[in-house]
Swiss-Prot record:
Mg(2+) binds at D8, E58. Its main location: cytoplasm. This is Holo-[acyl-carrier-protein] synthase. The lineage of its organism: Bacteria, Bacillati, Bacillota, Bacilli, Lactobacillales. Transfers the 4'-phosphopantetheine moiety from coenzyme A to a Ser of acyl-carrier-protein. It holds the Pfam family ACPS. GO terms for molecular function: holo-[acyl-carrier-protein] synthase activity; magnesium ion binding. Its EC number is 2.7.8.7. Keywords: Cytoplasm, Fatty acid biosynthesis, Fatty acid metabolism, Lipid biosynthesis, Lipid metabolism, Magnesium, Metal-binding, Transferase. It is found in: Cytoplasm. It catalyses: apo-[ACP] + CoA = holo-[ACP] + adenosine 3',5'-bisphosphate + H(+).
Amino acid sequence: MIIGIGNDTEAISRVGQIVARQTKFMDSILTPAEREQALERKGKHFHEFVAGRFSAKEAFSKATGYGIGEKVHWHDIEILNEPNGRPIMQVKNFRYKTYVAITHSGDFVNTVVIIERLTILERLSLKFFPKRGVL
């Protein structure tokens, strides 16, 4: 059952300006693994990646309804890519399943996060059959 949906849109150029001005921004927003993936990208793709992760974490905070800082911190949320490029969101000490979509168009990134409460059967199914893709 879906228990939360969050959406966020950010201007990629604005996030790029923040990264250029505030050297600690990336350290405070991204986990070490996310920073590693970000640094593999150059130019426009680097800014898209950082803006996408920032936006996705904001969308997660909207889906939960309690924001960043009170119960969940930036580093508690990690979004890494599968080999095919699909982003996967993992949240420390969070018992619900999360789904994230990140899309870029022009100077904007839009993200959607869905939080789902799984039944016991669904949790067991994921444990034994972790690849739960549509295709």
